[in-house]
């Protein structure tokens, strides 16, 4: 759905696609690979106010449970119900979005090149 070069990335391994003042948020291939098979996901509710850097949900895999941190501040305007009912979608397609938020200010995040360097092992 999204090309990696069109996205920006957080240090907590969320990706963001910016469309005017709307941010589409997902988790990166790198995070999905580290997590393994994803079996459960908890996301913020629609209309929730979110703050950049704060925990907004949880993702559970066969290996671990991790928190989801919001890469943006604003109001959640949509939640991807498909990924809640079928969290394994993230294992087959990391471009699956988690939630959309209307943002007041878009923060400085890493571009694809910076994120690639950040995740180099």
UniProtKB/Swiss-Prot annotation:
This is Glycine cleavage system H protein. The gene is gcvH. It comes from Tropheryma whipplei (strain Twist). The glycine cleavage system catalyzes the degradation of glycine. The H protein shuttles the methylamine group of glycine from the P protein to the T protein. InterPro entries: 2-oxoA_DH_lipoyl-BS, Biotin_lipoyl, GCV_H, GCV_H/Fam206, Single_hybrid_motif. Coiled coil: none annotated. Gene3D superfamilies: 2.40.50.100. The keyword Chaperone does not apply. The modification N6-lipoyllysine is found at residue 63.
